[in-house]
């Protein structure tokens, strides 16, 4: 990895001159600027954005990196962090990472370049070592929905595996033994942990796992439609379905309704997250509550305290999800059980 000394050597200037160019000092000549920027580009050198921000002093700005701000889950996260920023006299800047390593990294670096000393970051694809390097550069950076070894006190996460176990166990307690699962096709720990939680609950109850009852799709409504359509196409040998999140569950419910399959009379359905859509689909969706508002609020408060070197607030580093009972789950009817057995 290139250093500031490498840039200075290639540009034919001193390290101090490189520093002046990086910090936009008026003392740097135009020729020096051109030489330094050319060297930085040739070496793919990314300056320590945090050092620049600190050198310029920080503005009253909180940075937030989310997966996709159009996702209702991340919308709730944004609103919670924005409320903390507002009540503490700060502005909020947002970057989208889209569960892509390069875009997550760019979003973080862009926010630091905009002098955000307090950062709340949802990043699932950046490797631990690289993320640790960024955490060392940024004392006010807090991770949400991820635990990074060595920085546990600056991380706030949810026990996703337990949440999926809770959802699946609820279906089992209602008498279901043939349970499908609609999983996210994103290669992130959330998807892996929730799928494992589903398998855990089945194994604990002595129910053999059947991979034909697991389908994958984008973690949104259209992905839920596609995954449920695929599951139905394999034969209706199930009486209940657990979903990666509420958006997939909403899409799945639409497919079931379109096919004249009653929820929960013929097939029970359970989601995960408890976002707004769960209250407005019909029937209202039984789900697992992800306390994202509380978690995001604590993350923002912690980031601001760390950035200002103030006493740290009391926080919970790993939250436990809870079951929210609504109207999309019931005991399997005789007709549903017959369908599942005969198909």
From Swiss-Prot:
InterPro entries on file: HTH_LacI, LacI/GalR-like_sensor, Lambda_DNA-bd_dom_sf, Peripla_BP_I
Molecular function (Gene Ontology), one example: transcription cis-regulatory region binding
Name recorded for this polypeptide: HTH-type transcriptional regulator GalR
Chain ranges of the HTH lacI-type domain: 1-56
Keyword Transcription among record annotations: yes
Xref: SMART domains: HTH_LACI (SM00354)
SUPFAM superfamilies per UniProt: lambda repressor-like DNA-binding domains, Periplasmic binding protein-like I
Known pathway: Carbohydrate metabolism; galactose metabolism [regulation]
Biological processes per GO annotation: DNA-templated transcription; galactose metabolic process; regulation of DNA-templated transcription
Subunit structure comment from the entry: Homodimer.
Gene name per UniProt: galR
Keywords for the protein's UniProt record, in alphabetical order: Carbohydrate metabolism, DNA-binding, Galactose metabolism, Repressor, Transcription, Transcription regulation
Domain of life: Bacteria
DNA-binding residues: 4-23
Function: Repressor of the galactose operon. Binds galactose as an inducer.
């Amino acid at each position: 990895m290139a250093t500031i000394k490498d840039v200075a050597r290639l540009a034919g200037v001193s390290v101090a001159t490189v520093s002046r160019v990086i910090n936009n000092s008026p003392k740097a000549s135009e020729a020096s600027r051109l030489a330094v920027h050319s060297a930085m580009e040739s070496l793919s050198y990314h300056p320590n954005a945090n050092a620049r921000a600190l050198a310029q002093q920080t503005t009253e700005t909180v940075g937030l990196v989310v997966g996709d701000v159009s996702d209702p889950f991340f919308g709730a996260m944004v609103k919670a962090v924005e409320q903390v920023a507002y009540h503490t006299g700060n502005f909020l800047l947002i970057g989208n990472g889209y569960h892509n390593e390069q875009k997550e990294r760019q979003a973080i670096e862009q926010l630091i370049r905009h002098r955000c000393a307090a950062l709340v970051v949802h990043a699932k694809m950046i490797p631990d070592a690289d993320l640790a390097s960024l955490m060392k550069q940024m004392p006010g950076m807090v991770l949400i929905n991820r635990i990074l070894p060595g920085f546990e006190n600056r991380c706030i996460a949810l026990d996703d595996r337990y949440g999926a176990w809770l959802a699946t166990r609820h279906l089992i307690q209602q008498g279901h033994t043939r349970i499908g699962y609609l999983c996210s096709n994103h290669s992130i720990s959330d998807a892996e942990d929730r799928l494992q939680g589903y398998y855990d609950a089945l194994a604990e109850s002595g129910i053999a796992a059947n991979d034909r009852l697991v389908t994958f799709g984008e973690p949104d409504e259209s992905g839920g439609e596609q995954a449920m359509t695929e599951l139905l196409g394999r034969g209706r040998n199930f009486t209940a379905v657990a979903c990666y999140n509420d958006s997939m569950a909403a899409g799945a419910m639409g497919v079931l309704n379109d096919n004249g399959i009653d929820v929960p009379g013929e097939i029970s359905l359970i989601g995960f997250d408890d976002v707004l859509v769960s209250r407005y689909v019909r029937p209202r969706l039984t789900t697992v509550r992800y306390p994202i508002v509380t978690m995001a609020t604590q993350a923002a408060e912690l980031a601001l305290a760390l950035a200002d070197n103030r006493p740290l607030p009391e926080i919970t580093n790993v939250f436990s999800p809870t079951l929210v009972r609504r109207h999309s789950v019931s005991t399997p009817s005789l007709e549903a059980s017959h369908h599942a057995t005969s198909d």
